[in-house]
Amino acid sequence: MTQSTPRLMLAASVLALGLASNAGAEPTAEMLTNNCAGCHGTHGNSVGPASPSIAQMDPMVFVEVMEGFKSGEIASTIMGRIAKGYSTADFEKMAGYFKQQTYQPAKQSFDTALADTGAKLHDKYCEKCHVEGGKPLADEEDYHILAGQWTPYLQYAMSDFREERRPMEKKMASKLRELLKAEGDAGLDALFAFYASQQ
């Protein structure tokens, strides 16, 4: 009994040192992104219509959006509170992780005729910035994924832009005004159908 006591104490000391070492270790990208799965799905592919898929998202855009949530520049229901728990370095790690994931377009219904109209409107008003129909592209930078996103999410995001709860770049604002003047809200519905059709 007395001989085993020093061994037990040694084992306990080694275990305590190991726990202390792990507690001070930098969190990995996988650890940081675990909290995202509840809304954005495993590996960044959303299973809920109100949340965007963030797999293969452009890293610069990811960090910019997260910083916007953290500062309050981008309005949100919950993301602002979540973002406050992370540093810029954390955002960069998370961005690198999601960039490496494979994007899976949402499986959803859409109106085929409306999608055909939307494809033409996309080419006219959106393609210059959202190339290849808004798909994620390996060699592009500063892109936002539209193709295959859930339609309700795109509708909510557009509402935020139009009601100035989210900042909009000048080029986008100009093209949106042109689209709405020519097509009205029906033009947006056609665009949403086009993005939904890319599955």
Curated annotation (Swiss-Prot):
Major localization listed first in the record, in broad terms: periplasm
Protein modification: Binds 2 heme c groups covalently per subunit.
Keyword Transmembrane tagged: no
SUPFAM superfamilies documented for this protein: Cytochrome c
Keywords: Electron transport, Heme, Iron, Metal-binding, Periplasm, Signal, Transport
Coiled coil: none
Residues that coordinate or bind heme c 1: C36, C39, H40, M79
Gene Ontology MF terms: electron transfer activity; heme binding; iron ion binding
Binding sites annotated in the UniProt record for heme c 2: C126, C129, H130, M168
GO cellular component: periplasmic space
PROSITE patterns: CYTC
Compartments where found: Periplasm
Endpoints of the signal sequence: 1-25
Role: Diheme cytochrome that function as the electron transport subunit of sulfide dehydrogenase.
Subunit structure of this chain's protein: Dimer of one cytochrome and one flavoprotein.
Protein name from the UniProt record: Cytochrome subunit of sulfide dehydrogenase
Organism of origin: Allochromatium vinosum (strain ATCC 17899 / DSM 180 / NBRC 103801 / NCIMB 10441 / D) (Chromatium vinosum)
